[in-house]
Amino acid sequence: KRIEHAIQKKQRILVYGDYDVDGTTSVAMMYLFLKKYNKNIQYYIPCRYEEGYGISKKGIDYAYKTKISLIIALDCGIRAVNEINYAKKMGIDFIICDHHRPSEKIPVAAAVLNPKQTDCKYPYKELSGCGVGFKLIQAYCQKNKISFDQIVEYLDLLAISVGADIVPITGENRVFAFYGLKQINLSPRIGLQVLIEGLGKKKPFSISDMIFGVAPRINAAGRIQHANKAVEVLVEQDYNLAKVFAKEIEEQNNRRKELDQKITKEAVEMIDQNKNSTVLFSDKWHKGVVGIVASRLIESYYRPTIVFSEKNGILTGSARSVHDFDIYNAISKCSYLLEKYGGHKYAAGLTIKKKNIYLFIDKFEKVVSETISKDQQSPKIEVDMEININDVNEKFFRIIKQFAPFGPRNLSPVFISRGVFDNGYAKQIGDDKSHLRLNIKTERGSIPSVGFGMGEFFEKIKNGKKFDVCYSIQENIWNGRT
Protein backbone atom coordinates (compact mmCIF):
# COMPACT_ATOMS: atom_id res chain seq x y z
CA LYS A 1 0.00 0.00 0.00
CA ARG A 2 2.81 2.42 0.83
CA ILE A 3 4.40 1.90 -2.59
CA GLU A 4 1.02 2.28 -4.32
CA HIS A 5 0.42 5.52 -2.42
CA ALA A 6 3.85 6.87 -3.41
CA ILE A 7 3.24 6.02 -7.07
CA GLN A 8 -0.29 7.49 -7.11
CA LYS A 9 0.84 10.72 -5.43
CA LYS A 10 4.05 10.84 -7.52
CA GLN A 11 6.15 11.00 -4.36
CA ARG A 12 9.92 10.70 -4.54
CA ILE A 13 11.22 7.20 -3.78
CA LEU A 14 14.82 6.33 -2.91
CA VAL A 15 16.07 2.78 -3.51
CA TYR A 16 18.83 2.22 -0.95
CA GLY A 17 21.18 -0.79 -1.00
CA ASP A 18 24.44 -2.23 0.23
CA TYR A 19 27.65 -1.89 -1.79
CA ASP A 20 28.22 -5.60 -2.44
CA VAL A 21 26.88 -7.71 -5.33
CA ASP A 22 23.65 -8.63 -3.55
CA GLY A 23 23.02 -4.99 -2.70
CA THR A 24 23.83 -3.51 -6.10
CA THR A 25 21.84 -6.12 -8.05
CA SER A 26 18.92 -5.50 -5.66
CA VAL A 27 19.07 -1.76 -6.22
CA ALA A 28 19.34 -2.13 -10.01
CA MET A 29 16.34 -4.49 -10.04
CA MET A 30 14.07 -2.36 -7.83
CA TYR A 31 15.08 0.88 -9.55
CA LEU A 32 14.34 -0.51 -13.03
CA PHE A 33 10.98 -1.93 -11.91
CA LEU A 34 9.70 1.18 -10.11
CA LYS A 35 10.93 3.45 -12.89
CA LYS A 36 8.17 1.99 -15.08
CA TYR A 37 5.49 3.40 -12.77
CA ASN A 38 7.06 6.47 -11.18
CA LYS A 39 9.71 8.69 -12.75
CA ASN A 40 10.59 10.17 -9.34
CA ILE A 41 12.95 7.32 -8.51
CA GLN A 42 16.54 7.63 -7.33
CA TYR A 43 19.02 5.13 -5.94
CA TYR A 44 21.61 5.44 -3.21
CA ILE A 45 24.57 3.23 -2.31
CA PRO A 46 26.52 4.23 0.83
CA CYS A 47 30.23 4.89 0.47
CA ARG A 48 32.12 1.99 2.03
CA TYR A 49 34.76 4.34 3.41
CA GLU A 50 32.72 7.31 4.63
CA GLU A 51 29.50 5.60 5.73
CA GLY A 52 30.22 1.91 6.11
CA TYR A 53 27.69 -0.90 5.80
CA GLY A 54 23.94 -0.41 6.01
CA ILE A 55 21.65 2.56 6.54
CA SER A 56 23.59 5.73 7.32
CA LYS A 57 22.48 9.10 8.67
CA LYS A 58 24.31 10.68 5.75
CA GLY A 59 22.08 8.72 3.38
CA ILE A 60 18.96 9.80 5.27
CA ASP A 61 20.13 13.42 5.21
CA TYR A 62 20.56 13.10 1.45
CA ALA A 63 17.02 11.74 1.20
CA TYR A 64 15.65 14.64 3.24
CA LYS A 65 17.46 17.26 1.14
CA THR A 66 16.15 15.72 -2.09
CA LYS A 67 12.57 15.57 -0.70
CA ILE A 68 12.33 11.78 -0.59
CA SER A 69 9.20 10.50 1.17
CA LEU A 70 9.87 6.75 0.95
CA ILE A 71 13.11 4.76 1.18
CA ILE A 72 13.13 1.10 0.13
CA ALA A 73 16.17 -0.53 1.78
CA LEU A 74 17.54 -3.66 0.12
CA ASP A 75 20.04 -6.15 1.61
CA CYS A 76 20.32 -3.94 4.71
CA GLY A 77 18.28 -2.19 7.40
CA ILE A 78 17.19 -4.99 9.72
CA ARG A 79 19.42 -3.70 12.53
CA ALA A 80 19.14 0.03 11.74
CA VAL A 81 16.72 0.86 14.57
CA ASN A 82 18.21 4.28 15.41
CA GLU A 83 18.70 5.33 11.80
CA ILE A 84 15.12 4.51 10.86
CA ASN A 85 13.80 6.39 13.89
CA TYR A 86 15.93 9.32 12.72
CA ALA A 87 14.30 9.13 9.28
CA LYS A 88 10.83 8.96 10.80
CA LYS A 89 11.41 12.26 12.61
CA MET A 90 12.16 13.79 9.21
CA GLY A 91 8.92 12.47 7.74
CA ILE A 92 10.57 9.70 5.70
CA ASP A 93 9.04 6.22 5.64
CA PHE A 94 11.07 3.03 5.27
CA ILE A 95 10.37 -0.35 3.71
CA ILE A 96 13.05 -2.88 4.67
CA CYS A 97 13.91 -5.87 2.46
CA ASP A 98 16.71 -7.74 4.22
CA HIS A 99 17.89 -11.30 4.78
CA HIS A 100 20.49 -10.82 7.51
CA ARG A 101 19.85 -12.02 11.03
CA PRO A 102 17.69 -9.59 13.02
CA SER A 103 18.54 -8.49 16.53
CA GLU A 104 15.94 -8.65 19.29
CA LYS A 105 14.66 -5.19 18.39
CA ILE A 106 13.13 -4.77 14.93
CA PRO A 107 13.04 -1.27 13.36
CA VAL A 108 9.67 0.47 13.28
CA ALA A 109 9.06 0.85 9.55
CA ALA A 110 6.16 0.93 7.10
CA ALA A 111 7.02 -2.70 6.34
CA VAL A 112 9.79 -5.12 7.27
CA LEU A 113 10.40 -8.06 4.94
CA ASN A 114 12.89 -10.58 6.28
CA PRO A 115 12.24 -14.34 6.25
CA LYS A 116 14.63 -14.76 9.20
CA GLN A 117 12.31 -12.89 11.59
CA THR A 118 11.11 -15.32 14.24
CA ASP A 119 7.44 -14.57 13.53
CA CYS A 120 7.79 -14.73 9.74
CA LYS A 121 5.69 -17.55 8.26
CA TYR A 122 7.24 -17.42 4.81
CA PRO A 123 8.29 -21.04 4.13
CA TYR A 124 11.68 -20.45 2.50
CA LYS A 125 14.18 -18.75 4.80
CA GLU A 126 17.32 -18.59 2.65
CA LEU A 127 16.53 -15.86 0.11
CA SER A 128 19.27 -13.42 -0.87
CA GLY A 129 18.66 -9.70 -0.30
CA CYS A 130 17.80 -9.42 -3.98
CA GLY A 131 15.46 -12.37 -3.53
CA VAL A 132 13.55 -10.56 -0.76
CA GLY A 133 13.31 -7.50 -3.01
CA PHE A 134 12.01 -9.67 -5.83
CA LYS A 135 9.28 -11.08 -3.56
CA LEU A 136 8.17 -7.49 -2.84
CA ILE A 137 8.00 -6.80 -6.58
CA GLN A 138 6.13 -10.07 -7.12
CA ALA A 139 3.59 -9.21 -4.40
CA TYR A 140 3.06 -5.74 -5.87
CA CYS A 141 2.42 -7.31 -9.29
CA GLN A 142 -0.02 -9.88 -7.91
CA LYS A 143 -1.99 -7.18 -6.09
CA ASN A 144 -2.11 -4.97 -9.17
CA LYS A 145 -2.78 -7.81 -11.64
CA ILE A 146 0.53 -7.33 -13.44
CA SER A 147 1.65 -10.46 -15.29
CA PHE A 148 4.67 -12.38 -13.97
CA ASP A 149 6.02 -12.14 -17.51
CA GLN A 150 6.66 -8.46 -16.79
CA ILE A 151 9.22 -9.26 -14.11
CA VAL A 152 10.95 -12.31 -15.60
CA GLU A 153 13.55 -9.90 -16.99
CA TYR A 154 15.00 -9.43 -13.48
CA LEU A 155 15.91 -13.09 -13.01
CA ASP A 156 19.40 -12.50 -14.46
CA LEU A 157 20.20 -10.05 -11.65
CA LEU A 158 18.64 -12.42 -9.14
CA ALA A 159 20.78 -15.35 -10.30
CA ILE A 160 23.96 -13.32 -9.81
CA SER A 161 22.92 -12.26 -6.31
CA VAL A 162 22.16 -15.89 -5.36
CA GLY A 163 25.57 -17.05 -6.59
CA ALA A 164 27.61 -14.16 -5.20
CA ASP A 165 26.04 -14.01 -1.73
CA ILE A 166 26.73 -17.70 -1.07
CA VAL A 167 23.14 -18.49 -0.09
CA PRO A 168 22.00 -22.12 -0.40
CA ILE A 169 21.05 -23.07 -3.96
CA THR A 170 17.96 -24.94 -2.81
CA GLY A 171 14.24 -24.24 -2.98
CA GLU A 172 13.39 -20.89 -4.56
CA ASN A 173 17.05 -19.93 -4.88
CA ARG A 174 17.60 -22.95 -7.10
CA VAL A 175 14.68 -21.89 -9.31
CA PHE A 176 15.97 -18.30 -9.47
CA ALA A 177 19.49 -19.46 -10.32
CA PHE A 178 18.32 -21.93 -12.99
CA TYR A 179 16.03 -19.55 -14.87
CA GLY A 180 18.29 -16.57 -14.29
CA LEU A 181 21.19 -18.43 -15.90
CA LYS A 182 18.92 -19.41 -18.76
CA GLN A 183 18.18 -15.73 -19.34
CA ILE A 184 21.87 -14.78 -19.08
CA ASN A 185 22.69 -17.31 -21.78
CA LEU A 186 19.81 -16.29 -24.05
CA SER A 187 19.48 -12.51 -23.71
CA PRO A 188 21.32 -10.82 -20.83
CA ARG A 189 20.70 -7.15 -20.12
CA ILE A 190 23.26 -4.84 -21.73
CA GLY A 191 25.14 -4.16 -18.49
CA LEU A 192 25.65 -7.85 -17.81
CA GLN A 193 26.52 -8.49 -21.43
CA VAL A 194 29.49 -6.09 -21.35
CA LEU A 195 30.72 -7.51 -18.04
CA ILE A 196 30.49 -11.05 -19.40
CA GLU A 197 32.37 -10.01 -22.54
CA GLY A 198 35.25 -9.04 -20.25
CA LEU A 199 35.55 -12.67 -19.11
CA GLY A 200 36.70 -13.77 -22.55
CA LYS A 201 34.51 -16.89 -22.31
CA LYS A 202 31.89 -18.32 -24.62
CA LYS A 203 28.44 -19.70 -23.87
CA PRO A 204 27.09 -21.57 -22.06
CA PHE A 205 27.80 -19.60 -18.88
CA SER A 206 27.50 -21.35 -15.52
CA ILE A 207 26.84 -20.14 -12.00
CA SER A 208 30.61 -20.49 -11.43
CA ASP A 209 31.24 -17.97 -14.21
CA MET A 210 28.96 -15.55 -12.39
CA ILE A 211 30.53 -16.19 -8.97
CA PHE A 212 34.18 -16.07 -10.03
CA GLY A 213 33.93 -13.84 -13.10
CA VAL A 214 31.10 -11.31 -12.99
CA ALA A 215 30.63 -10.96 -9.21
CA PRO A 216 34.24 -9.89 -8.40
CA ARG A 217 33.98 -7.18 -11.06
CA ILE A 218 30.71 -5.84 -9.64
CA ASN A 219 32.21 -5.97 -6.15
CA ALA A 220 35.40 -4.21 -7.26
CA ALA A 221 33.51 -0.96 -7.89
CA GLY A 222 32.52 -0.68 -4.23
CA ARG A 223 35.82 -2.02 -2.93
CA ILE A 224 38.09 0.42 -4.75
CA GLN A 225 35.94 3.51 -5.42
CA HIS A 226 32.14 3.64 -5.25
CA ALA A 227 29.51 0.96 -5.90
CA ASN A 228 27.36 3.47 -7.80
CA LYS A 229 29.44 2.51 -10.83
CA ALA A 230 28.19 -1.08 -10.54
CA VAL A 231 24.56 0.04 -10.50
CA GLU A 232 25.22 2.40 -13.41
CA VAL A 233 26.44 -0.42 -15.63
CA LEU A 234 23.61 -2.77 -14.57
CA VAL A 235 20.84 -0.29 -15.42
CA GLU A 236 22.45 1.20 -18.55
CA GLN A 237 20.52 0.73 -21.81
CA ASP A 238 23.17 2.10 -24.18
CA TYR A 239 25.76 -0.52 -25.19
CA ASN A 240 28.62 1.92 -25.86
CA LEU A 241 28.14 3.76 -22.58
CA ALA A 242 27.89 0.45 -20.72
CA LYS A 243 31.24 -0.55 -22.29
CA VAL A 244 32.81 2.61 -20.86
CA PHE A 245 31.49 1.79 -17.38
CA ALA A 246 32.65 -1.83 -17.71
CA LYS A 247 36.15 -0.69 -18.66
CA GLU A 248 36.35 1.43 -15.50
CA ILE A 249 35.16 -1.51 -13.42
CA GLU A 250 37.75 -3.79 -15.05
CA GLU A 251 40.51 -1.34 -14.06
CA GLN A 252 39.20 -1.29 -10.50
CA ASN A 253 39.12 -5.09 -10.44
CA ASN A 254 42.77 -5.24 -11.55
CA ARG A 255 43.66 -2.81 -8.77
CA ARG A 256 41.72 -4.98 -6.32
CA LYS A 257 43.78 -8.03 -7.33
CA GLU A 258 47.05 -6.15 -6.73
CA LEU A 259 45.95 -5.03 -3.26
CA ASP A 260 44.66 -8.50 -2.44
CA GLN A 261 48.03 -10.14 -3.18
CA LYS A 262 50.06 -7.47 -1.37
CA ILE A 263 47.97 -7.42 1.81
CA THR A 264 47.65 -11.21 1.97
CA LYS A 265 51.44 -11.51 1.87
CA GLU A 266 51.81 -8.98 4.71
CA ALA A 267 49.07 -10.63 6.77
CA VAL A 268 50.58 -14.12 6.52
CA GLU A 269 53.77 -12.79 8.10
CA MET A 270 51.79 -11.48 11.10
CA ILE A 271 49.88 -14.66 11.96
CA ASP A 272 50.35 -16.29 15.36
CA GLN A 273 50.42 -20.00 14.53
CA ASN A 274 49.57 -21.08 18.07
CA LYS A 275 46.03 -19.72 18.21
CA ASN A 276 42.59 -21.05 17.35
CA SER A 277 41.58 -17.80 15.65
CA THR A 278 43.19 -15.11 13.52
CA VAL A 279 42.54 -11.39 14.10
CA LEU A 280 44.82 -8.94 12.27
CA PHE A 281 44.75 -5.19 11.59
CA SER A 282 46.79 -2.45 9.96
CA ASP A 283 46.30 1.21 9.06
CA LYS A 284 48.04 0.47 5.74
CA TRP A 285 45.47 -2.03 4.51
CA HIS A 286 42.74 -1.10 2.05
CA LYS A 287 39.29 -1.44 3.55
CA GLY A 288 37.86 -2.77 0.31
CA VAL A 289 39.81 -6.04 0.24
CA VAL A 290 40.00 -7.17 3.88
CA GLY A 291 37.19 -9.70 3.32
CA ILE A 292 39.03 -11.27 0.40
CA VAL A 293 42.23 -11.38 2.46
CA ALA A 294 40.40 -13.10 5.33
CA SER A 295 39.22 -15.79 2.92
CA ARG A 296 42.74 -16.20 1.53
CA LEU A 297 44.22 -16.63 5.02
CA ILE A 298 41.81 -19.45 5.80
CA GLU A 299 43.20 -21.35 2.82
CA SER A 300 46.57 -21.49 4.61
CA TYR A 301 45.53 -21.23 8.28
CA TYR A 302 42.20 -23.00 8.66
CA ARG A 303 40.47 -21.16 11.49
CA PRO A 304 37.93 -18.35 12.08
CA THR A 305 39.56 -15.19 10.74
CA ILE A 306 38.93 -11.45 11.01
CA VAL A 307 40.94 -8.83 9.12
CA PHE A 308 40.59 -5.11 9.94
CA SER A 309 41.65 -1.92 8.22
CA GLU A 310 42.15 1.17 10.37
CA LYS A 311 41.39 4.86 9.92
CA ASN A 312 41.23 7.64 12.51
CA GLY A 313 41.15 5.26 15.45
CA ILE A 314 38.30 3.15 14.03
CA LEU A 315 38.85 -0.40 12.78
CA THR A 316 36.51 -1.86 10.18
CA GLY A 317 36.75 -5.59 9.60
CA SER A 318 35.46 -8.58 7.70
CA ALA A 319 35.12 -12.00 9.29
CA ARG A 320 35.20 -15.36 7.54
CA SER A 321 34.62 -18.77 9.08
CA VAL A 322 35.50 -22.42 8.63
CA HIS A 323 33.10 -25.27 7.95
CA ASP A 324 30.16 -25.42 10.36
CA PHE A 325 31.53 -22.82 12.82
CA ASP A 326 29.12 -19.93 13.48
CA ILE A 327 31.33 -16.85 13.43
CA TYR A 328 28.35 -14.52 13.82
CA ASN A 329 27.51 -16.10 17.19
CA ALA A 330 31.16 -15.89 18.26
CA ILE A 331 31.28 -12.18 17.40
CA SER A 332 27.94 -11.64 19.20
CA LYS A 333 29.56 -12.81 22.44
CA CYS A 334 32.11 -10.00 22.03
CA SER A 335 29.54 -7.39 21.00
CA TYR A 336 30.00 -5.24 24.12
CA LEU A 337 33.40 -4.26 22.70
CA LEU A 338 32.07 -3.36 19.25
CA GLU A 339 30.51 -0.27 17.72
CA LYS A 340 28.38 -2.34 15.34
CA TYR A 341 28.31 -5.71 13.60
CA GLY A 342 26.13 -7.87 11.36
CA GLY A 343 26.26 -10.86 9.08
CA HIS A 344 25.74 -14.60 8.70
CA LYS A 345 27.04 -17.89 10.07
CA TYR A 346 30.07 -17.88 7.78
CA ALA A 347 30.71 -14.17 7.13
CA ALA A 348 30.27 -10.95 9.06
CA GLY A 349 31.28 -7.31 9.17
CA LEU A 350 32.18 -5.37 12.29
CA THR A 351 33.47 -2.02 13.54
CA ILE A 352 35.49 -1.38 16.70
CA LYS A 353 37.44 1.44 18.32
CA LYS A 354 41.19 0.87 18.23
CA LYS A 355 41.44 1.17 22.01
CA ASN A 356 39.31 -2.00 22.32
CA ILE A 357 41.02 -4.15 19.70
CA TYR A 358 43.36 -6.09 22.00
CA LEU A 359 40.53 -6.80 24.44
CA PHE A 360 38.51 -8.04 21.48
CA ILE A 361 41.36 -10.24 20.19
CA ASP A 362 41.65 -11.93 23.59
CA LYS A 363 37.90 -12.33 24.05
CA PHE A 364 37.34 -13.64 20.52
CA GLU A 365 40.16 -16.17 20.91
CA LYS A 366 38.62 -17.31 24.22
CA VAL A 367 35.15 -17.69 22.66
CA VAL A 368 36.50 -19.61 19.66
CA SER A 369 38.69 -21.86 21.82
CA GLU A 370 35.71 -22.76 24.02
CA THR A 371 33.26 -23.45 21.20
CA ILE A 372 35.16 -24.79 18.19
CA SER A 373 35.58 -28.55 17.87
CA LYS A 374 38.59 -30.49 16.63
CA ASP A 375 36.52 -31.58 13.66
CA GLN A 376 35.82 -27.95 12.69
CA GLN A 377 39.53 -27.14 12.78
CA SER A 378 40.48 -29.64 10.09
CA PRO A 379 39.80 -28.85 6.43
CA LYS A 380 38.03 -31.71 4.73
CA ILE A 381 37.12 -32.77 1.26
CA GLU A 382 33.69 -34.36 1.22
CA VAL A 383 33.77 -36.98 -1.52
CA ASP A 384 30.53 -38.21 -3.08
CA MET A 385 31.90 -41.31 -4.80
CA GLU A 386 35.05 -43.15 -5.80
CA ILE A 387 35.09 -43.82 -9.54
CA ASN A 388 37.51 -45.07 -12.16
CA ILE A 389 39.04 -42.19 -14.11
CA ASN A 390 38.07 -44.00 -17.32
CA ASP A 391 34.38 -43.48 -16.44
CA VAL A 392 34.72 -39.73 -16.93
CA ASN A 393 33.30 -38.94 -20.36
CA GLU A 394 30.71 -36.71 -22.04
CA LYS A 395 27.81 -39.05 -21.28
CA PHE A 396 28.76 -39.11 -17.59
CA PHE A 397 28.99 -35.30 -17.55
CA ARG A 398 25.53 -34.93 -19.13
CA ILE A 399 24.10 -36.86 -16.19
CA ILE A 400 25.96 -34.68 -13.66
CA LYS A 401 24.83 -31.49 -15.41
CA GLN A 402 21.19 -32.30 -14.67
CA PHE A 403 21.84 -31.48 -11.00
CA ALA A 404 23.01 -27.93 -11.79
CA PRO A 405 23.10 -25.08 -10.88
CA PHE A 406 25.55 -25.91 -8.11
CA GLY A 407 26.29 -24.00 -4.95
CA PRO A 408 25.91 -24.20 -1.15
CA ARG A 409 23.77 -27.22 -0.12
CA ASN A 410 23.77 -28.37 -3.74
CA LEU A 411 27.47 -28.66 -4.36
CA SER A 412 28.99 -29.96 -7.56
CA PRO A 413 29.69 -33.69 -6.98
CA VAL A 414 33.23 -34.45 -5.87
CA PHE A 415 34.81 -37.71 -7.01
CA ILE A 416 38.01 -39.50 -6.10
CA SER A 417 40.10 -41.63 -8.44
CA ARG A 418 43.20 -43.50 -7.26
CA GLY A 419 46.49 -44.36 -8.90
CA VAL A 420 46.18 -41.87 -11.76
CA PHE A 421 49.11 -40.13 -13.46
CA ASP A 422 49.82 -37.15 -15.68
CA ASN A 423 50.70 -37.72 -19.35
CA GLY A 424 53.96 -35.79 -18.95
CA TYR A 425 52.83 -32.26 -19.75
CA ALA A 426 52.06 -31.00 -16.25
CA LYS A 427 53.30 -27.51 -15.43
CA GLN A 428 52.89 -24.69 -12.96
CA ILE A 429 50.87 -21.77 -14.29
CA GLY A 430 49.91 -18.24 -13.23
CA ASP A 431 52.10 -15.21 -12.66
CA ASP A 432 53.33 -16.65 -9.37
CA LYS A 433 53.24 -20.31 -10.53
CA SER A 434 50.68 -21.03 -7.84
CA HIS A 435 48.34 -23.11 -10.03
CA LEU A 436 48.81 -26.50 -11.66
CA ARG A 437 47.83 -27.59 -15.15
CA LEU A 438 47.98 -31.28 -16.03
CA ASN A 439 46.46 -33.91 -18.30
CA ILE A 440 45.33 -37.03 -16.47
CA LYS A 441 45.90 -40.16 -18.54
CA THR A 442 42.92 -42.41 -19.36
CA GLU A 443 42.29 -45.40 -21.63
CA ARG A 444 40.87 -43.07 -24.30
CA GLY A 445 43.48 -40.33 -24.06
CA SER A 446 43.73 -37.69 -21.34
CA ILE A 447 41.52 -35.29 -19.39
CA PRO A 448 42.69 -31.64 -19.17
CA SER A 449 42.75 -30.61 -15.51
CA VAL A 450 43.51 -27.52 -13.43
CA GLY A 451 44.40 -27.43 -9.75
CA PHE A 452 43.93 -23.88 -8.49
CA GLY A 453 46.39 -23.01 -5.75
CA MET A 454 48.09 -26.41 -6.17
CA GLY A 455 51.30 -25.39 -7.90
CA GLU A 456 53.29 -26.69 -4.93
CA PHE A 457 52.28 -30.28 -5.81
CA PHE A 458 54.06 -30.20 -9.17
CA GLU A 459 57.11 -32.10 -7.91
CA LYS A 460 54.90 -34.85 -6.49
CA ILE A 461 53.10 -35.66 -9.72
CA LYS A 462 55.65 -35.03 -12.49
CA ASN A 463 57.49 -37.78 -14.41
CA GLY A 464 54.58 -40.21 -14.34
CA LYS A 465 54.33 -40.53 -10.55
CA LYS A 466 51.01 -42.07 -9.52
CA PHE A 467 48.69 -40.14 -7.22
CA ASP A 468 45.13 -40.07 -5.90
CA VAL A 469 43.00 -37.11 -6.94
CA CYS A 470 39.74 -35.53 -5.74
CA TYR A 471 37.95 -33.48 -8.37
CA SER A 472 34.76 -32.06 -9.78
CA ILE A 473 33.92 -32.05 -13.48
CA GLN A 474 33.25 -28.95 -15.57
CA GLU A 475 32.67 -28.31 -19.24
CA ASN A 476 35.07 -26.03 -21.07
CA ILE A 477 34.61 -25.04 -24.71
CA TRP A 478 37.68 -23.66 -26.49
CA ASN A 479 38.10 -23.20 -30.24
CA GLY A 480 35.10 -25.41 -30.89
CA ARG A 481 36.42 -28.26 -28.75
CA THR A 482 34.67 -29.46 -25.59
Question: What are these language model-derived features?
Answer:
Residues 444-462:
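Beta-strand/loop nucleic-acid-binding surfaces
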Residues 1-70, 90-91, 141-362, 370, ...:
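Hydrophobic helix-and-loop "lid/oligomerization" segment in the mid-to-C-terminal part
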Residues 387-447:
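Accessory interdomain/linker segments of ATP-dependent helicases and helicase-like nucleic-acid enzymes
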